Amino acid sequence: MANDFLFTSESVSEGHPDKVADQISDAILDAIFAQDPRSRVAAETLTNTGLVVLAGEITTNAHVDYIQVARDTIKRIGYDNTEYGIDYKGCAVLVAYDKQSNDIAQGVDQASDDHLNTGAGDQGLMFGYACDETPELMPAPIYYAHRLVERQAQLRKDGRLPFLRPDAKSQVTMRYVDGKPHSIDTVVLSTQHSPDQSETAKKMKASFTEAIIEEIIKPVLPKEWLKDTKYLINPTGRFVIGGPQGDCGLTGRKIIVDTYGGACPHGGGAFSGKDPTKVDRSAAYAARYVAKNIVAAGLARQCQIQVAYAIGVARPMNITVYTEGTGVIPDDQLARLVAEHFDLRPKGIIQMLDLLRPIYEKTAAYGHFGREEPEFSWEKTDKANALRAAAGR
């Protein structure tokens, strides 16, 4: 990639229909794990106007009121009025869960290459990434895109901007100079709102636009990056119909929002609703943990990790490190350090990151990475000193 360029990432709010589905799936996972952390869960959710469908595979000894969990999640998000297209009190909730296939379970319970270990729940490839663009070691465009929609929800819920409704999207286009963030070229923020905020179908009131820029955008973005920045606020105009009424929502359809905003490749597997024997989730968390510790150790300015697994096999097929020329030692040496310092077998990941806990609903909106939440063990940098010492730095 050239040293001077524009790069864009987007995020969506907790009220976006796909994120409603993700949060319901992870709320159900948490409710199950609170009773039986050894459960196998693959909880999928569909949301539409006045309707929630829960489907997937669950094997558990827990007794969970799935319908109530779905309603409670919708209420927390803010869909509490029939005018919004879905209302937690009156929406229909259909439940269609089955048990995990015995054919899958036998390979997960006992790995073919290590009978004392857990096999991967499926084949696949996962990526982790970290860079020094923000203190959280995340790419700046996705980090700030998340913070914009997070603030939209905050001001909606605390009543400071009472005309806001739950659905919203953000997009940040960053200008890079010499490969580093220099300024923000464009900010797009589209938010659902009450009907009185538009002058016409295609034009918002000036007071609405001003409130979004002054109360949501400017308090979040670094002032020094706002140099001739363009602001596009509800650029299509009126946005009253939104959420599951505006679009059908599905679990696992915002995988780039969930990760790095396109700054690195994605293996294709979604996270929400999956217990950590599913390496789509747990190995992606572990790869972030590895990459973040390498950057925190000062061994690279940016670091991409790829791991891959075969179903029923514990050990990863590969551990590949790519630092795009920013590493202080060769990438193959970093890969050997990773293999020495991190147990990337599924059971090792679960133990290393303490993943058999009801911690997942919080991950399902505003990004799984780059948030200093106490439950997010994959954001720790506790291996940085050991990696630095092992690298002789």
Curated annotation (Swiss-Prot):
Cite the Pfam families for this sequence.
Answer: S-AdoMet_synt_C, S-AdoMet_synt_M, S-AdoMet_synt_N
The organism of origin for this protein: Methylibium petroleiphilum (strain ATCC BAA-1232 / LMG 22953 / PM1)
GO MF terms, alphabetically ordered:
ATP binding; magnesium ion binding; methionine adenosyltransferase activity
Specify which residues bind L-methionine according to the UniProt entry for this protein.
57, 100, 247, 278
* CDD domains, sorted: S-AdoMet_synt
Encoded by which gene?
A: metK
Q: In which pathway does it act?
A: Amino-acid biosynthesis; S-adenosyl-L-methionine biosynthesis; S-adenosyl-L-methionine from L-methionine: step 1/1
Q: What is its EC number?
A: 2.5.1.6
Which reactions is this enzyme annotated as catalysing?
A: L-methionine + ATP + H2O = S-adenosyl-L-methionine + phosphate + diphosphate
Q: How does it assemble?
A: Homotetramer; dimer of dimers.
> This protein is called what?
S-adenosylmethionine synthase
NCBIfam families assigned? metK
Q: Kindly state which keywords UniProt assigns to this record, in alphabetical order.
A: ATP-binding, Cytoplasm, Magnesium, Metal-binding, Nucleotide-binding, One-carbon metabolism, Potassium, Transferase
**Positions of the UniProt region annotated as Flexible loop:** 100-110
Q: Where K(+) is bound, by residue?
A: 44
